[in-house]
C-alpha cells in the first residue's frame, strides 16, 4: 500500500525563509501561488511579460517578473507552465539560474521522466502533484480543507528534498487531506495511461461508438446523444462520490444486470490486450517520442484530428440540445 503523509509529517518552517518561484499563472499556478502566500510564505511569479498571466498575477498582488530573473531569486522553482513549453523555458531561462541548494519542482513528471529536462546534479528535483483542478485546490484551501497530492523525489542533492517538498505540500494545503508517495516514473506513466485508455481516449471513443451504433440503427441522434453522452455525468458523479459499488447501488436492477452481463462483452479480452499495448508505448517512451516530434513539426496530425473530431455529428447534436438546458447557460 502507498505511504501517505499528513500534517504531523510536514514542517512549514523548513521553507519559511525561502523564496518560492511559480512559473506560470494559469489553472494550477494561481492556486499554488495564492495558497502558499496565505500560508505565510514568500512567493514570486514568473510569466510572459504583458501576457494574461502577468496581468492577472499583478492584479492579485504578486511580485511578477520574467522567468530568468525569478530563477536567480527563487530557492524553490515550481514549473507550472504547460508540459509542451517547459523544456524550452527551462533551457532558455531557468537552467542558468540554478545553484547548489535550490530545488526544481514539478506537478507532472513528463519532462523529467522522458529526459526533456535534465537538471544539474547539485539541485533537488521533486514533484508535488495535486489531484484536482486548480480552482478546486484553491477553493478547498479557503474553506479550511485541502486536496490530496502526490509527492516524488527524483534527485536529493540537499539530503532534505522530501522534507522540503512536504513543507511545500503543506503550504498548498495538501497536508490536510494526505500526500501520497510515488515516483516520477509511476506518476507519469499512470497519468498518461489514464488519459489515453480511460478518462479521455477510452471514454470519448466509447461514447461515440455507442452514439454511432444507435444512429446507424435508425434511432434519432438526439435520443442517442441523451443515452450515450448526456447521462454519462449522472453515472460518473455517483462513481466519483462513492465508487463503483455505490453507483451500482444507486441504479435500477435492470441497469445493474445489464452492467454485469453486457459490460464485459464491450470491454473484452481484446480490449485488455490493446490497453497493454498502449501502456507499453508509454513505458518504453515511444508515445513520448511521437508527441515530442509532433510538437516539433507544428502538430500536423494533432490539428487534423482535432478538426475532424470537431465535425462529428455528436458535436452538432450536442450543441443544439445543450442550448435547451438553462442550467448550462448559467455556468458560462
UniProtKB/Swiss-Prot annotation:
Residues 183-328 form the KARI C-terminal knotted domain. It comes from Dehalococcoides mccartyi (strain ATCC BAA-2266 / KCTC 15142 / 195). Mg(2+) 1 binds at residues 191, 195. Residues 1-182 form the KARI N-terminal Rossmann domain. GO terms for biological process: isoleucine biosynthetic process; L-valine biosynthetic process. Gene3D superfamilies: 6.10.240.10, NAD(P)-binding Rossmann-like Domain (3.40.50.720). Pathway: Amino-acid biosynthesis; L-isoleucine biosynthesis; L-isoleucine from 2-oxobutanoate: step 2/4; Amino-acid biosynthesis; L-valine biosynthesis; L-valine from pyruvate: step 2/4. Its EC number is 1.1.1.86. Binds 2 magnesium ions per subunit. The gene is ilvC. It catalyses: (2R)-2,3-dihydroxy-3-methylbutanoate + NADP(+) = (2S)-2-acetolactate + NADPH + H(+); (2R,3R)-2,3-dihydroxy-3-methylpentanoate + NADP(+) = (S)-2-ethyl-2-hydroxy-3-oxobutanoate + NADPH + H(+). It comes from the Bacteria. Belongs to the ketol-acid reductoisomerase family. This is Ketol-acid reductoisomerase (NADP(+)). InterPro entries: 6-PGluconate_DH-like_C_sf, KARI, KARI_C, KARI_N, KARI_prok, NAD(P)-bd_dom_sf.
Amino acid at each position: 500500500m502507498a505511504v501517505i503523509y499528513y500534517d504531523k509529517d510536514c514542517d512549514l518552517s523548513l521553507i519559511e525563509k525561502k523564496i518560492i518561484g511559480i512559473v506560470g499563472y494559469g489553472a494550477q499556478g494561481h492556486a499554488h501561488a495564492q495558497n502558499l502566500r496565505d500560508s505565510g510564505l514568500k512567493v514570486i511569479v514568473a510569466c510572459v511579460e504583458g501576457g494574461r498571466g502577468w496581468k492577472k498575477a499583478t492584479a492579485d498582488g504578486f511580485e511578477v517578473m520574467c522567468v530568468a530573473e525569478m530563477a536567480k531569486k527563487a530557492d524553490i522553482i515550481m514549473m507550472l507552465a504547460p508540459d509542451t513549453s517547459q523544456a524550452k523555458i527551462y533551457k532558455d531561462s531557468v537552467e542558468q539560474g540554478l545553484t547548489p541548494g535550490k530545488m526544481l519542482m514539478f506537478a507532472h513528471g513528463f519532462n523529467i521522466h522522458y529526459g526533456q529536462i535534465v537538471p544539474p546534479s547539485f539541485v533537488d528535483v521533486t514533484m508535488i502533484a495535486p489531484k484536482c483542478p486548480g480552482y478546486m485546490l484553491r477553493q478547498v484551501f479557503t474553506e479550511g480543507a485541502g486536496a490530496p497530492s502526490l509527492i516524488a523525489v527524483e534527485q536529493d542533492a540537499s539530503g532534505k528534498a522530501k522534507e522540503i517538498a512536504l513543507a511545500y505540500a503543506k503550504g498548498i494545503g495538501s497536508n490536510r487531506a494526505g500526500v501520497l508517495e510515488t515516483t516520477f516514473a509511476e506518476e507519469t506513466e499512470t497519468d498518461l495511461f489514464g488519459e489515453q485508455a480511460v478518462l479521455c481516449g477510452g471514454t470519448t471513443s466509447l461514447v461515440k461508438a455507442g452514439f454511432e451504433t444507435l444512429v446507424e440503427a435508425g434511432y434519432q441522434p438526439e435520443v442517442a446523444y441523451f443515452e450515450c453522452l448526456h447521462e454519462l455525468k449522472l453515472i460518473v458523479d455517483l462513481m466519483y462520490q462513492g465508487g463503483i459499488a455505490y453507483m451500482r447501488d444507486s441504479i435500477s436492477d435492470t441497469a445493474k444486470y445489464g452492467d454485469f452481463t453486457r459490460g464485459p462483452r464491450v470491454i473484452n479480452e481484446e480490449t485488455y490486450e490493446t490497453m497493454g499495448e498502449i501502456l507499453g508505448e508509454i513505458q518504453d517512451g515511444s508515445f513520448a517520442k511521437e508527441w515530442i516530434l509532433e510538437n516539433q513539426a507544428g502538430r500536423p496530425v494533432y490539428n487534423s484530428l482535432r478538426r475532424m473530431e470537431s465535425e462529428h455529428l455528436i458535436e452538432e447534436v450536442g450543441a443544439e440540445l445543450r442550448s435547451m438546458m438553462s442550467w448550462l447557460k448559467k455556468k458560462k
